[in-house]
Amino acid sequence: MSNSAFNRRWAELLLEALTRHGLRHVCIAPGSRSTPLTIAAAANNKLICHTHFDERGLGHLALGLSKASREPVAVIVTSGTAVANLYPSLIEASLTGERMVFLTADRPPELMDCGANQAIRQNGIFASHPCQTISLPRPTVDIPASWLASVIDHSMANLQHGAVHINCPFAEPLYGNEEPAYDEWQQQLGDWWKSKTPWLSQPVAKVVAEVPDWDCWQQKKGVVLAGRMSAEEGVNVAKWAKALSWPLIGNALSQTGQPLPCADLWLDNPHVQEILAQAQLVVQFGSSLIGKCLLQWQAKCQPQEFWIIDPIPGRLDPANHRGKKLTCHIADWLLAHPAQPCIPWAQSCTLWAEELIVWSEKAVNCVRTELAGKFGEATVAYRLRELLPERGQLFVGNSLIIRLIDTLGQLPAGYPVYSNRGASGIDGLISTAAGVQRATAKPTLAVIGDLSALYDLNSLALLRHPSAPMVLIVVNNNGGQIFSLLPTQEEARQRFYCMPQYVNFDHAAAMFGLKYASPQNWMELQQSIKQAWQQNETTLIELKVPDREGAECLQQLLKQVAML
């Protein structure tokens, strides 16, 4: 029998074993060496196959699918530099916790380091970024089927956060007789094929990191910080903080409703800092804090203890406060540490929180006055909630736009918000948004900058046939205008940092068959959005705004509120 037949049986078992751990989505790039994996995935009716010709975009598509579905997602690519193109999405998953399985086809050992085409050293290519790295042997009947099933089961049982890299060498021939062969090798697993469970079951204990003296701590003056979390968690954290009468400072990714909006404006005010200096305990839920002023306050605050609750292992406090890193799911921790509203100092705490509400309202009034009658990226950030689709979701890009939304906007509590705020790169944002939309089949609004759109332009191909209406707003401020905030010489800043490209996106939309609009005022933008939500297709809306308007508006508002 040929290698092609057994390669197929090997790959079929590998993919089937993955499905026993809740894996439903597989993202596939074209390539010959990965043929056994591709054909096995396509033949498995438990799997939904997605394709893309660009491996970098493919990895981010899988990232978005995993982000929104909260399930593991597999990626299949051929050998060579196709593997290296997965690096950015793998790094992001390692930082934000999405579970991903990278299946990289490879040349067999005898073709390594001898000049063979498309043969690179793939074992360990991702260094320490995967949580696991598995180098499978060349498929052979001498290895029991139970060994392969057990390896996959063990890996998936321990895949709680981040990515696993499984390198899969296949020898030629990769194509050949399609007649069934080597069935006896697969049948070593008996009736497992008819079941729905793993060959090797390894239940993982669900542990909640409890604080034994919580009853004592909740009687102190606390501040709650809310970073990246799920919509359900955001709502529950907001309720928990309210019951304790503790002020909640939530960023745009917290989905808490940001009860104290415009925090990054008023946090820099000296009066506010005097109030917050009274905090005896700071509790941070989730990572990925966004605002510069919030990060500065978080770094210099000096409570008795600083706690971080996040399911991702590791240190998540750059300021290295004294306190606790509680590694567990936020929902589980809240259940184990309920808020008791009847506490001795509740009245004084309420007054303390109310004073922060006043400062938040002052900041909102400054924003309202500054943006009255204006149309630009700052206005879009401030009024973004008016553009959100009903029962939909939001994907926010990086760089200046997410800072503006975080600083000026107030998103609804429990409204799903997604982003790539692990490494916070501008690569793969369109493809990640495409994955988020495919995972949920919800109307989706994505907002990114012009350089981000150029960086992932290939992935507009992924938006051609959405399962629900999708709007991609490209804020075209002619370059990386977040660098306008840098204290550098103007000519050097434009050449080496902002890098204006002087492009329009109408031709890009046309090339990929997407609808296009370029509204000139708020009313036209609302009308374009309203029309887009009525059709199951993608509309690219380009907002051509003055280069520095957003950055200058942010600087002006920071100065205004700091001087109140």
From Swiss-Prot:
MF (Gene Ontology): 2-succinyl-5-enolpyruvyl-6-hydroxy-3-cyclohexene-1-carboxylic-acid synthase activity; magnesium ion binding; manganese ion binding; thiamine pyrophosphate binding
Free-text cofactor note: Binds 1 thiamine pyrophosphate per subunit.
Enzyme Commission code: 2.2.1.9
Required cofactor names: Mg(2+); Mn(2+); thiamine diphosphate
CDD domains on file: TPP_PYR_MenD (cd07037), TPP_SHCHC_synthase (cd02009)
Pfam families assigned to the protein according to its UniProt record, in alphabetical order: TPP_enzyme_C, TPP_enzyme_M_2, TPP_enzyme_N
Catalytic activity: isochorismate + 2-oxoglutarate + H(+) = 5-enolpyruvoyl-6-hydroxy-2-succinyl-cyclohex-3-ene-1-carboxylate + CO2
Subunit: Homodimer.
Function: Catalyzes the thiamine diphosphate-dependent decarboxylation of 2-oxoglutarate and the subsequent addition of the resulting succinic semialdehyde-thiamine pyrophosphate anion to isochorismate to yield 2-succinyl-5-enolpyruvyl-6-hydroxy-3-cyclohexene-1-carboxylate (SEPHCHC).
Protein name: 2-succinyl-5-enolpyruvyl-6-hydroxy-3-cyclohexene-1-carboxylate synthase
